Amino acid sequence: IADVIDDDDSIIASPADSMLGITVGAICGETHATSISGENIIAPYSRKGPGFAGFSKPDISAYGGTIAFDGHKPITPIDKYSLVMDRGGMLVPDAGTSFTSPVVAGDLAEISKIVPDEDLLISKALLYHNAIVLWDEDDIDEEELNLAHNLYGRGISTVDESKYSSASKVTFVRTGTLNREKKERVKVFMPELLAAQPGRNVAKGTITCLSNPPIDRTKGTEYLGAYIRASINKSNPTGSFSKVQPKYKEGRRKWDVCHQFSKKFSNFNAGDWQIWLEMFGRWEDGNNDVPYALIVTIEDMSGNLDIYNEVELLNRYQAIN
């Protein structure tokens, strides 16, 4: 599989490198003896990034079948990820991103059913935000994370994590517009139960900000007219705020439509933290109102605390499902 990944012909090409589209990769769901790939590894036929102007692609992945060899002939082995229905209504094994893309499209459609007005930008942000990563988040460097994103995107698409909070994991959703003259300071409540927990890395915050900027194909590599930068700022006992520096630059590039990062916390104050949002434009008429969807998740890493109830008792947030 390493030889396939290193082949320049395996790189994602137009139109799959579109910044505003959802590019879907394929991950093998099972291991087969005569396949060059295996479970949770990029499928032999799935293309890798980077995409346009060096930005990470694919955006997200789904499980699919693999390609194996029966003597000298390539075949698609039968497993629960390779079976598709043919024109005669029979289940047959087949493989390709043509089959993983509908999986992600279906997930997006299901998520949209619980989102107010079936808002596509919020649905898409939730899809990206809750993708299941296929790498060790605690033991990966910048270069390795960039490679992972160019093989797997943000991870495996999942519906349930995108539709619901849980007792120990609370997700906040906000949508709006930004321009050059307007900045957002979005308040997010950090539960007291969580702040009182002793130990290291007791809490995790994950932020995804997805924007829908204007585009102009005549601008070449600058066809994307704007981007929104997101940062997290934790509260101090004095009432001031301290900007939190994420571990990686990956996921926070200028002129990307999606800024996404996470951070674990050990010692911190409860109360209102802030997500700062700022828009940057680069055309002469670049002061457009740019729609965005912001998703923020606060998680108890022990899984034992009911932080959802504490947030609910504030009576400040409206449940959307």
Residue ranges and their predicted role:
Residues 100-114:
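Short, small-residue alpha-helix embedded
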Residues 115-139:
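An often Trp-containing, charged/polar helix-loop segment at the C-terminal end
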Residues 24:
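Alpha-helical segment proximal to the catalytic Tyr-Lys
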Residues 146-234:
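Secreted peptidase-domain scaffold signal
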Residues 218-260:
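Surface-exposed beta-strand/loop patches in noncatalytic accessory domains
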Residues 27-101, 118:
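Catalytic-core environment of secreted peptidases
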Residues 1-18, 92-95, 99-101:
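Substrate-binding/access-modulating region of protease and related hydrolase catalytic domains
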Residues 12, 223-237, 265-321:
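C-terminal edge strands of extracellular/lumenal beta-sandwich accessory domains
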